[in-house]
């Protein structure tokens, strides 16, 4: 459970829609994306019948038990393949407030926009705040779960908005899997509960990744499920519509045998004990039509969604064994899944880039264990860049050739961060979820031109806690133990640090990628926002403490200038009588740039700022906490 894991983590760091089930077919799920097909050598094979699938699972169970008895583990990867009807085209006027990895692929978060309203998910409740016609006014609030649901043992983590549907994604230890709550929202910002569904899965939580994506009106989930040796049927992906008194027997399978795929490998190759599933649910017309595809493989996983494909990298970690892994690709155009045997493991979703030259680029570590729970925070090992053409994917029998791995310098320390920005892979280490450290000898920034192969190393005056794109360049954010630094990096043929801004006696208030936002207003200019807190604060404190303020910096040709901050007023906090999700797993502060206005989401406060003579001033604020309207 997250609660128990949280205690362990803290100790370590401190020291009415209808559910539609699709009948079995021999085809993959209809396409989500209408992008052109990138051909591969061959695709994976699905099972031809239920009996063939069960026989294979029995062999898997036997192999797993034998290997466990021998205390041997090996690595591999698995992925699922899923799609749905082509998504509705994005509205031209849509403006995102989420710092996503790829444009057009929304990610589950804590704040979204619906028409003239902000929609906020906070501590087990949904809220709307009117922003149309210059307003800033709370409108509606409801529990983020159904009226007949006991929210104890459930974490409501993410939220997405599609047309007039608000989707809340959580994980229920009590009801057994990913919990999806659907809510109606109208043009006046009024919220109303519609229905709840459960998708059978193990906990999807990652300290860095997000469990859901949204392309058009198609909701995409990834979820692992460990195989149950006693009853394999309890491991198959299934959906249940919730009602009072619902039982486990009401789960209905959404993956027939002929949409379960296996890599063409010997079972001795790896420790195979997990079913990895990608599910696509159609939210059009108020429905919840879910279809899924699964692949059987080892437990370690990292989930990445490009604009036209889903990738799952699954692996096993062993004591005295060479790392072996498999990466699976599921195109969103509806074509079949494919796989490739590989080595190592990515750190998180930002370790991936499907580039426009039709290559998959992945930073891998020799000792990586995926990004489930907090594994990304302790990632370590030798580093390499894997660069492989997408056409080389096949049925899992082929391996990426050794020359496709380029060994890279290994940075000292932990808190590993990586990201592809433009033509460069950028990585380094910082403080992560721990306390900021003073260690200048370890503060180096590594940059690799992934297409041309050149490498560069730059000396920093601080750690690498955040890597973000800023126009065609990058900004590196990190601490030196006392102050918070922003280094502007020009990404040309020879990368260089152009300038550095230092905010004295401050630290990052948020660690997740959604905590940052850069709003460009020219080719080389714009404004960035980032939550900040007191100096020396451990990264994990964002789970329990609010940020002090949102800091805003002006960028002009990679020269930073502070334009001010919008601060919280903790003295105005009230008891919200929290019943669910009382830990901020996804943080609680966001900079918001919307329709020429600037907001700071700070817990239960939304503060609006205005630029006067190049300085940020507070215009007004509203507290949208339950029972409070001011």
Per-region residue spans from a language model:
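Beta-sheet-rich non-transmembrane sensory/scaffold domains
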Residues: 21-630
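Hydrophobic alpha-helical membrane-insertion segments, chiefly the h-region
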Residues: 10-22
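Positively charged n-region of N-terminal signal peptides that target proteins for export
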Residues: 1-4
């Amino acid at each position: 459970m997250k609660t128990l894991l949280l205690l362990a983590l803290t100790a370590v760091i401190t020291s009415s829609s209808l559910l539609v089930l699709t009948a079995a077919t021999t085809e993959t799920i209809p396409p989500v994306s209408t992008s052109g097909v990138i051909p591969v050598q061959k695709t994976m094979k699905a099972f031809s019948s239920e009996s063939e699938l069960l026989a294979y699972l029995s062999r898997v169970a036997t192999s797993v038990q034998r290997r466990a008895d021998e205390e041997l583990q090996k690595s591999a990867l698995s992925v699922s393949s899923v799609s749905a009807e082509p998504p509705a085209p994005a509205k031209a006027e849509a403006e995102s407030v989420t710092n996503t990895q790829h444009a057009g692929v929304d990610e589950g978060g804590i704040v979204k926009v619906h028409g003239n309203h902000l929609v906020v998910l906070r501590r087990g409740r949904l809220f709307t705040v009117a922003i149309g016609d210059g307003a800033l006014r709370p409108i509606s609030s409801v529990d983020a779960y159904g009226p007949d649901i006991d929210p104890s043992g459930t974490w409501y983590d993410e939220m997405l908005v599609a047309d007039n549907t608000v989707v809340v994604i959580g994980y229920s230890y009590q009801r057994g899997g990913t919990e999806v709550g659907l809510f109606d929202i109208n043009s006046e910002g009024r919220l109303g509960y519609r229905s709840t569904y459960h998708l059978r899965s193990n906990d999807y939580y990652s300290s860095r990744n997000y469990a859901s994506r949204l392309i058009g009106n198609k909701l995409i989930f990834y979820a692992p499920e460990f195989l149950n040796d006693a009853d394999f049927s309890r491991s198959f992906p299934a959906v249940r519509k919730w009602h009072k008194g619902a039982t486990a027997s009401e789960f209905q399978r959404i993956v027939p045998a002929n949409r379960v795929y296996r890599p063409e490998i010997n079972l001795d190759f790896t420790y195979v004990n997990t079913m990895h599933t990608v599910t696509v649910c159609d939210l059009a017309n108020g429905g919840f039509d879910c279809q899924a595809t699964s692949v059987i493989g080892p437990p370690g996983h990292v989930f990445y969604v490009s604009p036209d494909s889903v990738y799952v990298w699954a692996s096993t970690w062993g004591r005295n064994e060479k790392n072996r892994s498999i990466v699976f690709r599921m195109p969103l155009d509806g074509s079949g899944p494919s796989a490739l045997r590989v080595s190592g493991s990515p750190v998180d979703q930002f370790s991936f880039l499907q580039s426009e030259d039709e290559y998959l680029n992945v930073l891998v570590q020799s000792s990586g264990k995926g990004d489930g729970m907090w594994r990304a925070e302790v990632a370590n090992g030798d580093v390499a860049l894997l660069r492989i053409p997408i056409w080389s994917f096949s049925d899992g029998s082929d391996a990426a050739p050794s020359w496709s791995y380029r060994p890279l310098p290994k940075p000292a320390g932990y808190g590993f961060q990586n990201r592809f920005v433009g033509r460069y892979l950028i990585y380094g280490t910082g403080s992560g979820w721990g306390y900021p450290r003073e260690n200048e000898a370890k503060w180096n920034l590594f940059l690799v031109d992934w297409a041309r192969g050149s490498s560069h190393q730059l000396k920093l005056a601080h750690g690498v806690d955040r890597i973000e794109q800023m126009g065609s360049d990058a900004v590196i954010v990190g601490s030196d133990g006392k102050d918070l630094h922003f280094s502007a990096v020009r990404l040309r043929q020879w990368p260089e640090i152009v300038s550095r801004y230092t905010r004295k006696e401050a630290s990052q208030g948020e660690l997740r990628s959604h905590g940052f936002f850069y709003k460009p207003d020219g080719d080389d200019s714009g404004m960035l926002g980032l939550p900040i807190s007191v100096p020396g604060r451990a990264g994990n404190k964002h789970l329990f403490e609010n940020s002090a303020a949102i800091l805003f910096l002006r960028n002009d040709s990679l020269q930073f200038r502070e334009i001010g901050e919008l601060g919280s007023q903790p003295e105005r906090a009230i008891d919200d009588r929290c019943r669910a999700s009382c830990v901020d797993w996804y943080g609680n502060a966001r900079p918001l740039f919307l329709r020429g206005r600037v907001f700071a989401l700070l817990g239960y406060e939304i503060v609006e700022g205005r630029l006067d003579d190049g300085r940020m001033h507070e215009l007004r604020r509203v507290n949208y906490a339950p029972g409070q309207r001011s």
